[in-house]
């Protein structure tokens, strides 16, 4: 059973990696560079890089592949926690269970979600505790 679980985890990780590659081909070189730097810092701090990758893709998908809007949001966003919460509710509805796993497990509405929208990149909270980057 453990081997099966490990295999499923590897398949999911590969799926996420392929999705990230697809996204990265469509974003600016600056964002690509920032993504790699942020991912390396998470890895060095023992964070969950696959959750970071999945969150990166989910946020990108939220903007319906609109690269300009995505870049504007990730580079210039200065909204409040409530603004970000409303954005996800608009997309996924009030039911938290409707959120993708990586968002449902990563977001605590009571904390400042905008901490994720930093680094002129996205989705990295430099606190790296297990609350934000726990396994899904």
Label for each model-derived stretch:
Residues 1-136:
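Acidic interaction surfaces
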